[in-house]
């Protein structure tokens, strides 16, 4: 199989800014962008599931690459207001609207006899597995959102707390249009915040990362599966801690503790009439990853 693709395009953009005050700036932008699919899509072929595991449309399934998939394009308009604290940080708010063309969609289908025959797969082995693939949406998709960003060195604290910095950012988005039902993977709410302490000999950082519940993909209608049934990834809050201690100008000890609250990764399946207590399909417990080491600067 040979697939030819080219991305020779013009991407015009316009950026303007206006100083409302010495430390208050208004910005606006109009721009175009493109999103290329994973290059593995152009290889064609398929990935088979682990036949020793239970079939699962969210993870253990047949995946088919789409060599004919196109890159999506988008037109975006954005406004932003930025306020600067003198020498110690900034806070900003922004709003945007993005209209997509040929956006990526995903679908999960049953393994039909025709599909199994096309790829030469044994029906007795693979007919119980779902088939997942990607394609370009032919319908419209619009994404609208708000953004907030804050970062500041807390110089107003007492002398014993010198070196403390705080940050927070948030993104809230919504998708509208005929193609929204086939969208997968976007997260409506993202929140990140944290605090750090920096001293000449050491530094310490604590970060919180929150992602809201997000849709993973449409599930094909089948036995006991009603229309408009989707797989979902549950909301999750991760807490990470990291730090360094310098033994000398060139050598330091470091620690990186990921997911210290041991947040679970749940996969749910829900249709219009699925009770809340019956939505949990899979629970992954990856635990907390702790890394310690020594580093040098040469």
Model regions and ranges:
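Signature of Gram-negative outer-membrane beta-barrel scaffolds
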Residues: 1-23, 37, 54-58
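Short loop/turn motifs that connect adjacent beta-strands in outer-membrane beta-barrel proteins
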Residues: 23, 88, 155-164, 250
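Transmembrane beta-strands of outer-membrane beta-barrel proteins
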Residues: 26-28, 91-93, 162-168, 193, ...
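Gram-negative outer-membrane beta-barrel transporters
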Residues: 97-99, 104, 109-111, 116-218, ...
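Outer-membrane beta-barrel signature, preferentially recognizing the C-terminal barrel domain
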Residues: 5, 34-100, 121-153, 186-187, ...
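Residues on the lipid-exposed face of transmembrane beta-strands in outer-membrane beta-barrel proteins
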Residues: 14-18, 69, 79-83, 148-152, ...
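Flexible, surface-exposed loop regions and adjacent strand-edge segments
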Residues: 43-52, 107-117, 181-187, 212, ...
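C-terminal beta-signal and adjacent terminal beta-strands/loops
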Residues: 101, 164, 212-222, 244-298
């Amino acid at each position: 199989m040979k697939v030819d693709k080219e991305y020779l395009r013009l991407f015009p953009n316009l950026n303007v800014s206006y100083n409302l005050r010495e430390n208050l700036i208004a910005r606006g932008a109009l721009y175009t962008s493109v999103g290329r699919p994973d290059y593995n899509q152009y290889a064609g072929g398929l990935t088979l599931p682990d036949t020793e595991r239970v079939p699962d449309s969210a993870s253990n399934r047949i995946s088919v690459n789409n060599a004919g998939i196109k890159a999506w394009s988008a037109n975006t308009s954005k406004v932003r207001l930025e306020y600067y604290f003198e020498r110690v940080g900034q806070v900003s708010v922004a709003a945007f609207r993005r209209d997509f063309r040929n956006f990526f969609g995903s679908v999960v289908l049953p393994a039909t006899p025709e599909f199994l025959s096309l790829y030469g797969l044994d029906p007795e082995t693979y007919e119980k597995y779902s088939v997942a693939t990607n394609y370009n949406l032919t319908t419209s998709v619009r994404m609208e959102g708000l953004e907030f960003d804050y970062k500041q060195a807390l110089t107003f604290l007492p002398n014993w707390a010198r070196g403390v910095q705080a940050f927070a950012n948030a993104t809230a988005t919504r998708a509208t249009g005929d193609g929204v039902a086939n969208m997968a993977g976007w997260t409506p709410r993202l929140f990140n915040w944290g605090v750090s302490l920096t001293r000449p000999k050491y530094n310490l950082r604590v970060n919180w990362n929150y992602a809201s519940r997000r849709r993973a993909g449409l599930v094909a209608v089948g036995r006991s599966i009603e229309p408009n049934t989707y797989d979902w990834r549950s909301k999750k809050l991760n807490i990470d801690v990291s730090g360094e201690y310098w033994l000398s100008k060139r050598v330091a000890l470091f620690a990186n503790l990921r997911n210290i609250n041991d947040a679970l990764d749940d996969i749910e399946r829900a249709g219009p009439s699925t009770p809340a207590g019956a939505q949990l399909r899979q629970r992954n417990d990856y635990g907390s990853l702790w890394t310690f080491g020594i580093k040098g600067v040469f």
